[in-house]
Amino acid sequence: MNTEYAELHCLSNFSFQRGASSARELFDRALRHGYAALAITDECTLAGIVRAWQASKDTGLPLIVGSEMHLENGPKIVLLVENLTGYQALCTLITVARRRAKKGEYRLLLEDFDHLPGGLLAIWLADIEGDAQACLAQGNWLRERFAERLWLGVELHRGADDEQRLADLLALAQSLAIPAVASGDVHMHARGRRALQDTITAIRHHTTVAEAGHLLFANGERHLRSLDALAEHYPDWLLAESLRIARRCTFTFDQLQYEYPHELVPKGQTSTSWLRELTERGIRRRWPRGLSVAARAQVEKELALITEKKFDSYFLTVHDIVEFARSQHILCQGRGSAANSAVCYALGITELNPEKSNLLFERFISKERDEPPDIDVDFEHDRREEVIQYIFRRYGRGRAALTAVASTYHGSGALRDVAKVLGLPPDQINALADAFSRWSDSLPSPERLREYGFDAETPILKRVLALTGELIGFPRHLSQHPGGFVISEHPLDTLVPVENAAMAERTIIQWDKDDLDLVGLLKVDILALGMLSALRRTFDLVHLHRGKQWTLASLPGDDRPTYEMISRADTIGVFQIESRAQMAMLPRLRPEKFYDLVIEVAIVRPGPIQGDMVHPYLRRRNKEEAITYPPKLKSVFERTLGVPLFQEQVMEVAIIAADYTPGEADQLRRAMAAWKRHGGLDPHRERLRTGMLANGYDADFADRIFEQIKGFGSYGFPESHAASFALLTYASCWLKCHEPAAFTCALINSWPMGFYSPDQLLQDARRHHIEIRPVDVRYSHWDCTLEPLDHPDSTRNLAIRLGLRMLRSFREEDALRIEAARSKRPFADATDLAQRAGLDSRAAEALADSGALRGLIGHRHRARWEVAGVEAQRPLFDDVTSEEVQVTLPLPTVAEDLVADYATLGTTLGPHPLALLRRQLAAKRFRSSQDLLSLENNRTLSVAGLVIGRQRPGTASGVTFVTLEDEFGMVNVVVWRDLAERQRKVLVGSQLLQVFGRLESNNGVRHLIAQRLYDLTPLLTGLEVRSRDFQ
């Protein structure tokens, strides 16, 4: 007799730190063994079920949806989904259990089962070793609620008492008149994962493997066993029962019906008619002179496709969210593929006119592609929460939630957890973690381990590294997506379980953002963008001080001084083109118009660089190489000089040259994005080549196009995305050029954001001759503000007054009390300030230490003395006076002020630290950033500077870019991979860095190619300078 079996109790690695195998591994192994079906029953979660469904579809092995659950003061059960009703009931049950507990836990109560609908089958995992009467009571309780849908699970794992255990379980089932079924309590796909299963068990219980004892399984039998092995353990009829259960479980995710909310539609309208009405209103606003024939045709095409795909309500919802933000004066802008849409532009969701941008709508929505659109909208980063809470209020927490992100184990984090439970001491764990690359999950080489004092051949180290390698990539927990919202017409917990997020007032669904497309859920991304906060604040400051009310749309376009500033790479603080790599590209590309900015935003990316597209484009732009492309592809290549730089261009080439449909072209884009991880490009190679040859293109051109597509990998940048970002790039550059004080002030008030610290932004402002005034309790507000200059130039220029937000650890509420008290009358002295503003000693000392009392009391030493003498107000002793002791305190030295400035403010308005060290550095023949401007190419030299940034972008093939700052400006340093590996401690740990290397100078771009690094941080004598690393 052939054994047949369906595994009904199996955990994947989405039972965090319990399951030791992925769904893909489990399905592959179950298929190999000849199982009839496989249930994934992760504990009180469906977080991994969509991936299990994908594995099921790929292998052809049926998936049974289920979940293992432990009831509080009740039985342990496995629930299996029989049909759609059962699936909805399971989602609701998990939601109830998760929402009443803190993040990462659940509480399932007996009363949760009192009114459970049908559609769920239950396998009872009875505790027959405990109280017999309690066990019978649990069985009766379950039988009353599940009746003919209850089985007793029989799980045998080669224990010494298996025979007796089987007899006891069968006797229990007989006494309760319920059927029994074989199940495996599977935790791994193969026996070889037992060591990892032991390891993650110890991690979960915060112990070591050596001390875990009975927390670990006695053997490795909780894997997917062969049918022959199962037949040795279980009677045939127990195995056959699993098939009867499996046949009852007919639910698939194709049965889910998802609807977007309808309540935004007024009476007398449908979602289709209301979307058209809003679109026509937007057209009259966006195109006051009327639409062109081509634009009208595009709008009609889009509206027809939106209706055909039943996306009308989705667009209405996004429009509603954007309108709310604008009603609250929150700056926002849609981006990404939505910028391809004329309807999105008309609705005010995006700011890019697709009629002028030649963008490809099929990149956004395609008739052939049965997938929902994905609209990303950026909001001011410090006001996005207002938008998020509006969505929760508008739709209710039952119908709106954020998507999850499955946070996974990475190199050093996995290493630390594994090494700890295997008993390594903390100092060795730290050293091992340091040996891991900061930039990848690959295990350290034997050579690198030796450098850090380890012998790679020792058994314990080999075991630690092997287990770390297995754990890397495993899901560790669910975190929340930065802003992806799922909103539904019906309760979300009938589609997917919902649980509490780590942040208060937020809830998340249990599915990762990448799972949504597979099940057809629509997501709108409510994203945070710091530059929008800075731009809005700049507009407000300009309006306050100049009377001008700028908007993104009203800023003058094609401004020559702005583009000249950009071409000089004078772009510290602006959007997207402020990194060292971008700044190195700017003098070579020399943008002159808006589309040049679109190119600039996109070209310094892994896709164009790895596809060898950057240098050909620059040569053609600089007329060093002929611009060539087939005449039929002029509409595709003319704007990028014959070099494909964008995903949309690849799609257009496939459509025009190889007869792809728009939907097929989008499939090519998706295959292109995923081929390095999953393959899938090979079918397109032959399809493209054959199609292009049939249409008269030569083989070399076809092969070159395909190689460039491969080069894009997963990094191809959408033109629509680049164009949307370029709008903000231009706006920030225009404001930096024409309103530098307001722009810098707004950047600091919006921090943390961007690439540079407030210190670096202020140093840049000073180099641009903007006056910076110190924090002063007599004038400063919480935010930095603008003040008129005292000289006649004041009609055009403004000074920045630093705000109390600059003081480290100073509270905003203290600042607001200071403002309120000062508005009534000026402060007389430290006592008056402390008493009227209600400041405690901590706040008063912070003001003194930072120099904020200099104008009221005097220098830091005197201010600190005065503050120390201020006593809290005591009404009982109001009439008692104490004699004041007069003390003369010395002025702080320049160096003391410098150290105190950085310690309390993170910046200084005094001399730059390097200015104080310049004589000492010059004696050692160190060059300054100013010197480098006049030195010839290939000169070897030494420089020293404060490390203000370290970058290792994916474009750079292991190169680290370091930015040093001295009193004159910045030095760009290139550190090749081998030097970075050899001197990692110096590279990563230095605050003041000496670099010996070779100067490269080309087209106005200067780099120092590092040959040796030295840590000069001790010269700073207590000065702490923070760099912005690896952004």
From Swiss-Prot:
It is an enzyme of class 2 (transferase). It is found in: Cytoplasm. CDD domains: DnaE_OBF (cd04485), PHP_PolIIIA_DnaE2 (cd07434). Signal peptide: none annotated. GO terms for cellular component: cytoplasm. SMART domains: POLIIIAc. Keywords: Cytoplasm, DNA damage, DNA repair, DNA replication, DNA-directed DNA polymerase, Nucleotidyltransferase, Transferase. Its EC number is 2.7.7.7. It catalyses: DNA(n) + a 2'-deoxyribonucleoside 5'-triphosphate = DNA(n+1) + diphosphate. Its main location: cytoplasm. GO terms for molecular function: 3'-5' exonuclease activity; DNA-directed DNA polymerase activity; nucleic acid binding. GO terms for biological process: DNA repair; DNA replication. Belongs to the DNA polymerase type-C family. DnaE2 subfamily. DNA polymerase involved in damage-induced mutagenesis and translesion synthesis (TLS). It is not the major replicative DNA polymerase. PANTHER family: DNA POLYMERASE III SUBUNIT ALPHA (PTHR32294), ERROR-PRONE DNA POLYMERASE (PTHR32294:SF4). This is Error-prone DNA polymerase.
